[in-house]
Amino acid sequence: MEGFTIWLTGPSGAGKTTLAVKLAKKLREMGYKVEILDGDTIRKTLYPNLGFSKEAREMHNRIVIYMAKLLTRNGVIAIVSLISPYKRIREYARKEIGRFMEVYVYAPLEVRIKRDPKGLYAKAIRGEIRGLTGYDGVYEEPENPEVKVDSSRMTPDEEAELVIRKAKELGYLP
């Protein structure tokens, strides 16, 4: 089987990691080789002091793109869970990787604030951090993702099934 990349984009707390884990489980149960490339995990493991400037985010995204490209080229389904706030970098990922599907993981701001798994929204509301993507920082919503899921209205299972159906429609899965 040829590999491909499922690129999960969306603001913090939208449900990207939850969907990535659910998708990986379902795809592995179907017999596929799958790797999750989680933006937070990669950042903490490889370069914890990188920072969050636009340049640092772009460098981080380019590294993840390269990793996904290598996995895809070697017959693995790469599931990328990464905010990737800039349209231009997501377009670059699509061009570089080739076999690629963009999944916009959406949840309304009030839902993300309630979830707040990393405590980032609480810090932003208190004024302790600035530029939080999807709060007071830039997030350029995808215009034509292959799939859009609203994690406030769908279960992770429903989201994963929708993504798998689309991957089949695109010919990435039989």
Swiss-Prot record:
A molecular-function term among this protein's GO annotations: ATP binding
Pathway: Sulfur metabolism; hydrogen sulfide biosynthesis; sulfite from sulfate: step 2/3
EC code: 2.7.1.25
Catalytic activity entry: adenosine 5'-phosphosulfate + ATP = 3'-phosphoadenylyl sulfate + ADP + H(+)
Catalytic residues (UniProt): S84
Superkingdom: Archaea
Single Gene Ontology BP annotation: sulfate assimilation via adenylyl sulfate reduction
SUPFAM superfamilies: P-loop containing nucleoside triphosphate hydrolases
Binding site for ATP: G10, P11, S12, G13, A14, G15, K16, T17
GO terms under cellular component: cytoplasm
Alphabetical keyword list: ATP-binding, Kinase, Nucleotide-binding, Phosphoprotein, Transferase
Class of the enzyme per the UniProt entry, highest EC level: transferase
Name of one Pfam family that matches: APS_kinase
Family of the protein in this entry: Belongs to the APS kinase family.
Function: Catalyzes the synthesis of activated sulfate.
Protein name: Probable adenylyl-sulfate kinase
Native source species: Pyrococcus abyssi (strain GE5 / Orsay)
